Amino acid sequence: MSEDPNAQGNSRRWIVRAVEDSLRRLGTDHIDLYQVHRPDANTDLDDTLSALSDLVHQGKVRYLGSSTFPAETIVEAQWTAERRGHERFRVEQPPYSLFVRGIEASVLPTCERYGLGVIPWSPLNGGFLTGRYRPGEAPPATGRAARMPQRFDPERPGVARKLDLIP
C-alpha cells in the first residue's frame, strides 16, 4: 500500500506504520485480525511479536495471525510468545487447494497442536481450478497468468496433466 520500496518487512517500524495507515484508511479504531504475511529473515521474531503485542495492548489490534509460515516458524513463534509474554498468533493462513496440499504434512498438525485456526488462501489455486486455463489455448494476457506464465502454461506437461483433471 506504499510507494516506498523499503516499506516492508516485519520490523516494529513497518508493522506500526502499516497498522496506523490501515486504521486511518479504514476510518476505524481497531483491526479485528492482523496477519503477518511470510516470515522476515531480516527481523528477529521476538521483535515482531513484541510490536504486535504492543498493538494488541493498545487496543489497535484484537487478534494476531500469520500467513504462509512454515510449521517450524509457527512453533518458534508460539514458543517465543510464551517465553517472552507476548500475544500469540491465533490463526495461520496457508495456501491450500486440491493441487497445493503440502500443509497437510506439517502445518495443519502444528496448527492443531497449538490451537491455531486455519484460514486457507487460494483454494482455487490462483484460478487454476476454475477451468479458465485449457490445453491448446493460450492463457489470458492479463492477470495472474501474465505475471507467472510458467505456472499457468497449459503446454507444460505437469500443468497439462493437472488441467486434464479439471472438468
Can you annotate each of these PLM segments?
Residues 9-26, 74-79:
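Short, acidic/polar
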Residues 23-42:
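Active-site groove signature of glycoside hydrolases
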Residues 43-167:
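Beta/alpha (TIM)-barrel catalytic core signal, keyed to glycine-rich beta->alpha loops juxtaposed to Asp/Glu
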Residues 1-16, 37-43:
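Active-site mouth loops of central-metabolism enzymes
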Residues 1-2, 30, 141-145:
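Short, basic/glycine-rich phosphate-binding loops at helix/coil junctions
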Residues 20, 36-39, 69, 97:
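Flexible loop residues that form catalytic
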